[in-house]
């Protein structure tokens, strides 16, 4: 969708305000490769797209990469594969991974298909606490009340439903902080079972 592509938000300025420069980033973890999730993978320099984080490893599901490559000509992803992914691959900065993949002692990437074939979730462990980044496995908090509801963008609706329930049940079992990308503020929530659905306790 054009509304999610080539936007001029002060993202790098916000990163700098947090004390991080692009050259200091070690990893870029990709839940999936839709254009609204890969916009800062590259930036324009002298009329061409170059990696925004020149010293980082961009970790991408191989299944997701293959799916995006096969549909590169589709109009619904705004040329993101050509402009946002291939410059990273051509620079030798991509790590294509299969199945569960760990990074150090704190990060674990696990398959979470449905929204796209190679969509993943990312667990961040910090001592006794942990959080779960779920990408586009959910788009709205209403999906806690109605976990079988999909967005119109889920490529495999049945798998998306099963994945969503699995991720929510994981958060309940391990008291993991749910970290969705599309809810808006306050962004993070604990999850409780509520009958056949789920309730959220959003963080202040």
Question: Where do the language-model regions lie?
Answer:
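Metal-dependent catalytic neighborhoods of phosphoester/phosphodiester hydrolases
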Residues: 38-48, 190-191
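Short, well-ordered, mixed-charge alpha-helical segments that flank or form enzyme active sites
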Residues: 35-39, 67-69
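Active-site metal-binding loops of divalent metal-dependent hydrolases
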Residues: 33, 63-64, 114-116, 135-137, ...
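Short polar/acidic secondary-structure junctions
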Residues: 101, 113-114, 125-126
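Cap/insert and terminal regions of metallo-dependent hydrolase folds
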Residues: 2-13, 127-204
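Metallo-beta-lactamase
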Residues: 3-20, 24-36, 52-111, 159-166, ...
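Short beta-strand scaffold segments in enzyme catalytic cores
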Residues: 119-124
């Amino acid at each position: 969708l054009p509304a999610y592509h080539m936007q001029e938000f002060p993202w790098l300025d916000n990163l700098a305000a947090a004390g991080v420069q692009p050259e200091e980033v070690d990893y870029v973890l990709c839940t999936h490769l839709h254009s609204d999730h890969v916009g800062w993978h590259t930036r324009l320099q002298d009329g061409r797209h170059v990696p925004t984080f020149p010293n980082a490893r961009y970790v991408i599901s191989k299944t997701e990469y293959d799916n995006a490559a096969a549909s590169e000509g589709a109009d619904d992803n705004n040329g993101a594969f050509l402009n946002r992914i291939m410059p990273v691959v051509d620079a030798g900065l991509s790590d294509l991974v299969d199945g569960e993949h760990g990074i150090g002692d704190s990060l674990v990437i696990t398959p979470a298909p449905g929204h796209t074939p190679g969509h993943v979730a990312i667990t961040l462990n910090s001592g006794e606490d942990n959080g779960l980044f779920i990408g586009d496995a959910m788009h709205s908090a209403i999906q806690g009340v109605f976990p079988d509801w999909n967005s119109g963008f889920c490529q495999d609706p049945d798998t998306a439903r099963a994945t969503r329930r699995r991720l929510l049940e994981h958060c309940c079992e391990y008291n993991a902080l749910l970290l969705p990308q599309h809810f808006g503020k306050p962004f993070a929530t604990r999850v409780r079972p509520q009958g056949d659905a789920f309730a959220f306790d959003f963080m202040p």
